[in-house]
Amino acid sequence: ADACSGLQGFLIFHSFGGGTGSGFTSLLMERLSVDYGKKSKLEFAIYPAPQVSTAVVEPYNSILTTHTTLEHSDCAFMVDNEAIYDICCRNLDIERPTYTNLNRLISQIVSSITASLRFDGALNVDLTEFQTNLVPYPRIHFPLVTYAPIISSERAYHEQLSVAEITSSCFEPNNQMVKCDPRHGKYMACCMLYRGDVVPKDVNVAIAAIKTKRNIQFVDWCPTGVKVGINYQPPTVVPGGDLAQVQRAVCMLSNTTAIAEAWARLDHKFDLMYAKRAFVHWYVSEGMEEGEFAEAREDLAALEKDYEEVGTDSFEDENDEE
């Protein structure tokens, strides 16, 4: 950072489930808050998949790290391995995706998010602007990430997708990087980052079409503004990789109450193990206290509650008060 003339912030890549990904990251985030208090910290967090598991103690690690980093992180983009596995199988016809396949998909998202810092465009969005537009309350900083088009090289020869098509596919649960259903939640904020051969007029038409759909709900206390970024640099892909070279792509970042589903799933798994105090001795022998588990779990329960509250309509609250 000392060699950097205009430090904007930090991008931190880690997993929730592993010991290093959760434990070391928590320590690092705390140190960064002390040493670089004002700089933004964006996380790309690999969230434990609902069905497949790499470690039995994933729920513990995830909840402990979320609790510890909640106040230190400005924005955390969640990605879950299972969602990406499914996308690789379904959209790219890869029977047994490897970590390389998964990482190439995630790297497209990171590339889209940072493109505005690196290239020129009609509407550029920088790192701090993301936070301003996506985070209505400090704790509610877990946007859902969707990317389109995800098509294999074979299929791209005979189909180039329009702006309207890639925009509408962003609202399909199948293209999301976390397993949850936005049709069950409400959108608080939405950011569309287009790149390649895209003009503002097409974007406006596409977004207007989305807003007429009834199954996409915004909270009533937030104007249904969609923040748009357009970058003229077309998406680049790894030569010989799985993804097709396309003329245009979009990455959607949306803050939706549906992501609370993911927390609820994780909390449930935590509760099942913690009720029996299973595996807790490993943590205690490393110097942790058992009380820290309960504290972290309470914080997550509060986070679920926060999501529930922001999703309720404001006129309901007024009626309650009367």
Curated annotation (Swiss-Prot):
User: What EC number(s) does the entry state?
Assistant: 3.6.5.-
Location in or out of the cell: Cytoplasm, Cytoskeleton
Q: What's the domain of life for this entry? A: Eukaryota
Tell me which stretches of the chain form a coiled coil. none
Catalytically driven reaction(s): GTP + H2O = GDP + phosphate + H(+)
- InterPro entries for the chain: Alpha_tubulin (IPR002452), Tub_FtsZ_C (IPR008280), Tubulin (IPR000217), Tubulin/FtsZ-like_C (IPR037103), Tubulin/FtsZ_2-layer-sand-dom (IPR018316), Tubulin/FtsZ_GTPase_sf (IPR036525), Tubulin_C (IPR023123), Tubulin_CS (IPR017975)
PANTHER family cross-referenced by the UniProt entry: TUBULIN
Q: How does it assemble?
A: Dimer of alpha and beta chains. A typical microtubule is a hollow water-filled tube with an outer diameter of 25 nm and an inner diameter of 15 nM. Alpha-beta heterodimers associate head-to-tail to form protofilaments running lengthwise along the microtubule wall with the beta-tubulin subunit facing the microtubule plus end conferring a structural polarity. Microtubules usually have 13 protofilaments but different protofilament numbers can be found in some organisms and specialized cells.
What name does UniProt use for this protein?
Tubulin alpha-4 chain
Q: Which organism is it from?
A: Gallus gallus
Read off the lineage from the record: Eukaryota, Metazoa, Chordata, Craniata, Vertebrata
